[in-house]
Amino acid sequence: VLFTSINNIGEAKELPLQNKIKHMKIEQIYTGCLAQGAYYITSDGEAAIIDPLREVGPYLQRIERDNVQLKYIFETHFHADFVSGHLDLSDSTDAPIVYGPLANPAFEAIVAEDGQEFKVGKVTIKVLHTPGHTMESTVYLLKDEHGVDHCIFSGDTLFLGDVG
């Protein structure tokens, strides 16, 4: 696993993970002024993005750089504190937008069921409904090609040292 964090001024640093899996790469794209982290995941020619920011250029550049197809755009919940780029990203790539249970989007999207799984290359992203921050709040569990749990993307359900 290559896990890279990219801050709001474009600096990248590799973050250590205990297990090294060759079929998965994760980048965190962090915007400090909003305290918002988006995630770009690639595996075997496919990609997923979790909670994209409004400016979709950085995601499109990564997709082109890595020569991958964007398969899904995941949203952990409807965001009131920033404008998501999910609609523009979907329009640019034809990738479907995925929300968790109880979401009621006014646009075309997949409203996933609790426990539903989505394949991205050789990895799997599992939907875990976690209402609280919002009723449709969802965390996404990333599993490697062997079905081993690796990390969870919690959106605003969990904050560093706090709950959402």
Which residues make up each language-model segment?
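Active-site environment of divalent metal-dependent phosphoester hydrolases
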Residues: 56-57, 78-83, 104-107, 135-136, ...
